[in-house]
Curated annotation (Swiss-Prot):
Sequence similarity: Belongs to the EPSP synthase family. MurA subfamily.
Pfam families xrefs: EPSP_synthase
Lineage of the species this protein comes from: Bacteria, Pseudomonadati, Thermodesulfobacteriota, Desulfovibrionia, Desulfovibrionales
Family matches, as Gene3D superfamilies: Enolpyruvate transferase domain
Enzyme Commission (EC) number: 2.5.1.7
Modified residues annotated as 2-(S-cysteinyl)pyruvic acid O-phosphothioketal in this record: 115
Protein's pathway: Cell wall biogenesis; peptidoglycan biosynthesis
Name of the protein: UDP-N-acetylglucosamine 1-carboxyvinyltransferase
Amino acid sequence: MDKLVIEGGVPLTGTINVSGSKNAALPILMASILAEEPLTYTNVPRLRDIHTTNKLLSILGCPAEFEGDTVSVRPCDLKPEAPYDLVKTMRASVLCLGPLLARLGEARVALPGGCAIGARPVDLHLTALEKMGARFELEEGYIIGRCRKLKGAHIYFDFPTVGGTENLLMAATLAEGETILENAAREPEVVDLARFLIACGAKIEGHGTSVIRIQGVPRLHGCEYAIMPDRIEAGTFLVAAGITGGELLLTGCPWEELDAVIVKLNAMGMHIEKTSEGVLAKRRNGGLRGTDVTTQPFPGFPTDMQAQVMSLMCLAEGTSVVQENIFENRFMHVLELVRMGADIRISGRSAVVRGVKRLTGAPVMASDLRASASLVLAGLAARGTTHVQRIYHLDRGYERIELKLNAVGARIRREAE
């Protein structure tokens, strides 16, 4: 198991290229199950979860090969079982459920794992698929689903679930008749999945709105598709510029998809602008100011940026309040930031952050993916040395983050614990 050792206090200056989106790539790769012809994906990040997904696809009968940032998938002899040994490490593995039911009429998927940041129940997925004709039972830790042929249905989500929207979107492409997803997730990654499915021959309208209509088709063909840039990785690097007092140019950076984050960072005293070369981020003269953040489904402030922005709040003048509305138990990074000198108090789903003059390096432990990123950011700004342990969480969502940061002036080394 590795850790990161960070020598803080260095302003970051230079250019960083934003990788492809993990949260877009995972469902799109799972959608390979739906196609009957070879597929080629470009701009794919080399992450643990992506490698796990490729292994899972190969076991399911869709051999997947990585070369550079390209993944090639050859759907052939499909099998219905997603085994526990792979599924236990990754929550997104449940996304193979809808495609398997659509193609084979059966699926045997182990209950998934991933970050421990709340319940994230799969019940919404199962209830919706049942409306399309699927039947489920739980047996020895496996979700076993069966259907003759999925039928189009009108499905209303009580909450705009991203994973549920993606699973049903994929399943509905091969269902008989029309499926309507109401109160659907509007996240850019859902839109990217829909665009990919359309490139394969699916008939989808309304993606990016709260009502998506899918007209089932008999089959999907292959295509070549470029994965969208990772808005959360990009947002993390924007915060890195602000927290270190540096100046970074992000190439391949999404803009509209980051609007809610950019508005808050600018309100805190950063200057972020779109240029012909990319997105430029730096701290304005006058220092950082506190602000309030409430996490919401897209187009609101993303829960996946909450921990990173909280690190910035720790060094901002005044008081900031974070209200977490998406996941319970997503303040596990707070105690570690407090170890570094932060002044944070938690009350239910709210955290009150009072800015301090400096953070001090300390040994800290990552609890989930985005908490890991917040601790790295805090370490970049801290006086002294920070040891971030259990960075296997970090490797699930960031493509060798220490190499990208070191290229713009950071002093980070990876060591075995």
